[in-house]
Amino acid sequence: TPLLLMHGWPGSIVEFLHIIEKLAHPEKFGGNIEDAFDVIVPSLPGFGFSGRPSKPIGPRKMATILNKLMIENLEYENYLAQGGDWGATIANWIGYDHSKSCKAIHINCLTMRHPDGPQTKQEEEWQQRFNQDQIMQDGYRTQQATKPQTLSYGMMDSPVGIAAWIIEKMYSWSDLKDNNIESVYSKDALLANIMVYVVTKTFNTATWIYYGRREEGGRFFPKEFKKIEIPTAAAIFPSEMSEWPPRSYVDRMFNITQWTEMPRGGHFA
């Protein structure tokens, strides 16, 4: 079974290195070979080792590009898609626009919103908490969605600047023990992820996805939105960067076949 794994920002393919072999060869780890996947882990367009678009593109366009990769370039008849952060957003759009090709999606983050907004008191209370949370969360996102090049000129000449910009998110969005980032990530893992941005000189083009989504219409599905009917699994981690909407809200958007509230973990799971 082909399995497309998609990272987000400020992540990279480094996030998946420790699980690729387990998914591709479960028999080496006490599992059954019948459960093996063909694992495809691309750098998103503009990120890392992938090509750089000539101008900003958003997650919906990236969904089309990655669907083409799977169906036309790699010649799979169908596939499964998994993602967190932007990878989850792209998985949403794959489920919406390419349901004939993608048979199921798994997400551990939800950034898209229903065009009709909250419908119950519980959902309205969640929306209020989310809006309040964004006062402190939204600074980097606003910069990258409106003036990414201004930020990039400084960062492209400063590996320390890139490291600080990225590690602040890794620290803030993770389920740390005693506020120690090394309780979750080794220095090698942190530096490997940072160096993907530094060595490939893609800090600037990686931020473009925020600009691209704004041009695509932002976090809301279009007004003519119809529920995504392919099977959808959701993994909810307690230290996610933003609280998930209530289950009732999510059920109006997806055909949820598995809903798992994890005992620990954060945005980068």
Describe each region flagged by the PLM.
Residues 9-21:
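The serine-hydrolase catalytic nucleophile loop
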Residues 144-269:
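C-terminal subdomain of alpha/beta-hydrolase-fold enzymes, centered on the catalytic histidine
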Residues 20-36, 69, 73-129, 137:
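Conserved hydrolase catalytic core segment
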